Amino acid sequence: SSTCIPSGQPCPYNENCCSQSCTYKENENGNTVKRCD
């Protein structure tokens, strides 16, 4: 009963995302965080 993570939210793996794609993005602080595409 796992729900998918919406676009723009932090994610551990591709499979966790509704889009099935979790990639590194740079946030406003200049830190790199994996988020759903």
Swiss-Prot record:
Key word Secreted present: yes
Keywords, ordered alphabetically: Calcium channel impairing toxin, Disulfide bond, Ion channel impairing toxin, Knottin, Neurotoxin, Secreted, Toxin, Voltage-gated calcium channel impairing toxin
UniProt KW Secreted keyword: yes
Free-text tissue specificity from the UniProt record: Expressed by the venom gland.
Cellular compartment(s): Secreted
GO biological process, one term: defense response
UniProt main location, coarse: secreted
GO terms assigned for molecular function: calcium channel inhibitor activity; toxin activity
InterPro entries listed in its UniProt record: Omega-atracotox, Omega-atracotox_CS
Site description Critical for insecticidal activity, residues in chain: 10, 27, 35
UniProt record similarity statement: Belongs to the neurotoxin 08 (Shiva) family. 01 (omega toxin) subfamily.
Name this protein carries in UniProt: Omega-hexatoxin-Hv1b
Organism: Hadronyche versuta
